[in-house]
Amino acid sequence: MQIEKVYEPQRFEPHWAQWWIDSNIFRANPESPGRVFSLVIPPPNVTGVLHIGHMLEHTEIDVSTRWHRMLGDNTLWLPGTDHAGIATQMVVARQLKEEGINYRDLGREKFEERVWQWKAQSGDTIKRQMVRLGASCDWSRERFTLDPGLSRAVREVFVSLYERGLLYRGEYMTNWCPSCNTAISDLEVAHADVAGHLWHIRYPVNGMPGRFVTVATTRPETMLGDTAIAVNAKDPRYQDLHGKTVQLPLMDREIPIILDDLADPQFGTGVVKVTPAHDPNDFEAGKRHNLAKIQVIDNNARMTAAAGPYAGLDRFDARKRVVSALEEIGALVKVEDYPLSLGKCDRCKTPVEPLISTQWFVKTKPLAEKAIAVVESGEIGFVPQNWTKTYYEWMYNIRDWCVSRQLWWGHRIPAWHCGECKEIIVAREAPKACPRCASENLTQDTDVLDTWFSSGLWPFSTLGWPDQTADLAKYYPTTLLITGFDILFFWVARMVMFGLEFMGEVPFKQVYIHGLVRDADRQKMSKTKGNVIDPLVVTEKYGTDAVRMALLQGAAPGTDIVLTEERMESSRAFANKIWNAARFLFMNADQSAAAPAEPTIEDRWIVSRLNAAAETANRAIEQYRYHELAQELWKFFWHEFCDWYLELKKVSATGWGNAVAAFETALRLLHPAMPFLTEELWQRLERKEGDPKSIALAQYPQYRAELADSEAEKEVAIIQEIVTLARTLRTESKLDPKQQLKGALYCRTASLAIAQRHADAIQKIARTTLEFKAEAPPKADVIRSTVEFDLVLDVPKVEEDPARKQKEREQLEKNIANSKRQLGDEVFLSKAPAKVVDSIRAKLVDYEAQLAKML
């Protein structure tokens, strides 16, 4: 059978991507027998496109999914997207702004219609990209977090939490983003260390002329809302101030001196200002002492009327004006540099403002206790295991979760406010009248739920809950979750809490946390650095399978992945090698008559090596050691199948049916990692009755003890050893690899007979005519030895080229310098795998030895 000369993955990859879907290859059936393997996708935001981090994640998921499917498991990978509340609203609001429309002027209903229109136009982008990249999802079960069924699940959970006393509404200090104009959770605040200042301000004590207390603050603009000064009751410096008041500078307001542990005698002056409306600790102190809450900064980060002459100013402009005014009246004692941890909105990077607002909260402590217990008991395991500690640290220190957002896009909170008696009715469906006063003047809460609320239900809401569906019964709990560390708390922990609360079972049994994809300099990829790799661009350039293999090569648990153009180019060469191997086989094998013949020594050897590779590959996938899978596949296909087996086959030129059979098994072994290439080649092989219609449904090779052939492995190892000796001598003697040579092989063990038995193969592959001698070797200029063999070559004398020698010396010196630079780089040594560092050290020793010979 003929196969195209040039490997062009762009020609066949789109075809198979669509064919798999059209042929229902990945469709799961809850009634099918077999062990269940199920997982859900971490739903990408509907606003986005796939980045290289997605491709890493999806490749790892796909490898595990395809492997389980080929093991015969009842396999489901459920896909979908997230409505991404804040992100989506910002995108559409920006589009409207470009059209000269303020989204608020449009009104909620019209704005929501516009968002749905936008979603219809761009919402399939993620799916198209995932399909193109080979994700073996069951697309018939694709879900969206705002689908009717999932929305019903959200309402059910919200109301149930409320009924169980685990959800409440209250006035609390929240993180407010002035740009997104909504409250955000603690996890959505990104803290950055910045250089700030500490302003020391004097407050005059009333009734004690000449007596002042000095307060240090990083936010002088908030002093306009001070309602007290606090000292510690045990601080001897301020015993005479108990029960006194001070006059608030700039505002001429009398405020009390309170006794509270908020003031630490060991920190600063031991006196703190108390601003209950603008600091979470002060808010709690205000509740303890029944202090007024004066809000001087509004939701847009501008000063309120309560700020007096500073009303209307931006908060940072107000800071400058306040500091200047304090200086003018002599109330500013000093200013000193002070490092700050500045909280910014993780999405828009605007500094957040602690503001008091009425929000909905989930009581997380009772939920977290159960979520901790299932990890402690081993019901859920983390890989790598060190993430368990991180999970515990957050769960043990968990705070109530603010779940309401001041947005229009999302799951609207199922609560209605009575316009007459102010009763709040939480219900699964819209009530017709107030149960307290019978008024029909009801208005639904305007807020929506945090996006992570609906995402937290993803493992069971996508399977039909709250209905008891066949899918839910079969595929929950899911088997595995593969995700990034950045959403361990946002998403993973919340799925555990909700799964236990509403399903009574863990949502998954194992969580594999993958690393980041970094560039050649181990830098994190970002648009600002200009080092972002677009997966669709590189897959078009190198082929999807090549990019997948390049990612898998670096995907060791607990490490980040370095992805470079060189690695992708190398992986494309690997795919091309397999393609050319197929061409060679197809040209030599008459498949219609390719019945297995009596196996030659190389046939027995390749079956044994393939058996060993299957053992390693299965173990690697099972343990999420995707890098070991890639290494084993590369070693087998390139070095064993192509470099040795096919070369030996050229010599024997028999048993092509055995070669095709081995190649077919090898394609199945490779399929989870490189699905497109393997499907293309597998479909060109002769089909037998009963064969599945896709390699994706074929059986994955398993280790079988009876296929291990130590005798064949020993004999081929001798062939390899002698050929390698000959090739090494050629290289050292700087001879043309194609030049025919003569030589003698000396051996005084039984291995000589094996070598003689395979003399034809050894001599043809080594391009060397040999004499085989059972004696010790003579002294010779061109000799190489191993434990059993000594090879002497008859090498013609060649005048050495001084220019070439100088060039080789310069290259060695360059290699030595590069190796020393890497080994002297502490950052590199701390991050590079031990194997890589050891390899560089070994190469350095070799380079220095070669250079010493030349000097």
UniProtKB/Swiss-Prot annotation:
Coiled coil segments of this chain: 797-827
Keyword Protein biosynthesis recorded: yes
Chief site of localization: cytoplasm
Taxonomic superkingdom: Bacteria
Protein location: Cytoplasm
Catalyses which reaction(s): tRNA(Val) + L-valine + ATP = L-valyl-tRNA(Val) + AMP + diphosphate
InterPro entries associated with the record: aa-tRNA-synth_I_CS, aa-tRNA-synth_Ia, Anticodon_Ia_Val, M/V/L/I-tRNA-synth_anticd-bd, Rossmann-like_a/b/a_fold, tRNA-bd_arm, tRNAsynth_Ia_anticodon-bd, Val-tRNA_synth_C_sf
Transmembrane segment boundaries: none
Keyword tags: Aminoacyl-tRNA synthetase, ATP-binding, Coiled coil, Cytoplasm, Ligase, Nucleotide-binding, Protein biosynthesis
PROSITE patterns per the UniProt record, alphabetical: AA_TRNA_LIGASE_I
Function: Catalyzes the attachment of valine to tRNA(Val). As ValRS can inadvertently accommodate and process structurally similar amino acids such as threonine, to avoid such errors, it has a 'posttransfer' editing activity that hydrolyzes mischarged Thr-tRNA(Val) in a tRNA-dependent manner.
PANTHER family the record matches: VALINE--TRNA LIGASE, CHLOROPLASTIC_MITOCHONDRIAL 2 (PTHR11946:SF93), VALYL-TRNA SYNTHETASES (PTHR11946)
Binding partners and assembly: Monomer.
Family per similarity comment: Belongs to the class-I aminoacyl-tRNA synthetase family. ValS type 1 subfamily.
Protein name: Valine--tRNA ligase
Taxon lineage: Bacteria, Pseudomonadati, Acidobacteriota, Terriglobia, Bryobacterales
